[in-house]
């Protein structure tokens, strides 16, 4: 297994790259090195004793949100900040440095978990864990409108829809436990297209769709592992994310070569480079 994407380094840039300091995201600044290009030097990630890739340049940012409960994160429409769901019913907007710019209370009140966005329209979707339902969010009013009832199966406790991703006209939904399963629905018709049981995670948490190759990224908040998988559940690569105490939320930032996480326990924002 190899982490993706891998960009071959240019020998002529090797010495210059060695002299550069690690990138530090400061308030108001872009998280890309000044003078950076689309062909930055990159080396293969190291692997730990568990066979997990070790991410580079791990950084943490305070959000100032006191009540624990961050559950999901997605990039905003402009790619310069985030939407973060809180399971007490709030949807936050933050910058790259964790600064909160708005907090919208969602109606109805629910145990909100996974976030997703249709990038072609900017439509935001969110899932309600215990209800096992998908809603569309109006950020102006905070109104959440039901769009998919889903399948009410499995345990009756709070181990339902935990992660949500949108891609290629489909919803991908992670059911946390009992069963540990990923459902795929056609968004337009609401038809269930497939369901795949997974045996490797302890808790299915957030999902992210990778539109470069149609694969999924899945966080396991209990084992502290990030997995890149095919939609049939086949593992492509796995990463150690134990630097996040309880990694509930994840999003992929291909523009900057970063993985972003939110911690359910601390409400901190974390980043790490996969390059």
Q: For each predicted feature, which ranges?
A:
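Beta-rich, blade/repeat-based domains predominating
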Residues: 65-77, 109-119, 153-168, 199-214, ...
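C-terminal motif of bacterial Sec signal peptides marking the signal peptidase cleavage site
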Residues: 15-17
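Short loop/turn segments that connect beta-strands within beta-propeller blades
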Residues: 95-99, 138-142, 186-190, 229-234, ...
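Blade-level signature of beta-propeller repeat domains, shared across WD40, Kelch, NHL, RCC1
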Residues: 249-275
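A short helix->beta-strand "capping" segment at the edge of beta-propeller domains
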Residues: 44-68
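A short beta-strand motif characteristic of beta-propeller blades
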Residues: 56-64, 99-106, 143-155, 191-198, ...
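Bacterial signal peptide processing site
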Residues: 19-22
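Conserved beta-strand positions in repeat-built beta-propeller and related beta-rich domains
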Residues: 76, 83-88, 124-132, 173-178, ...
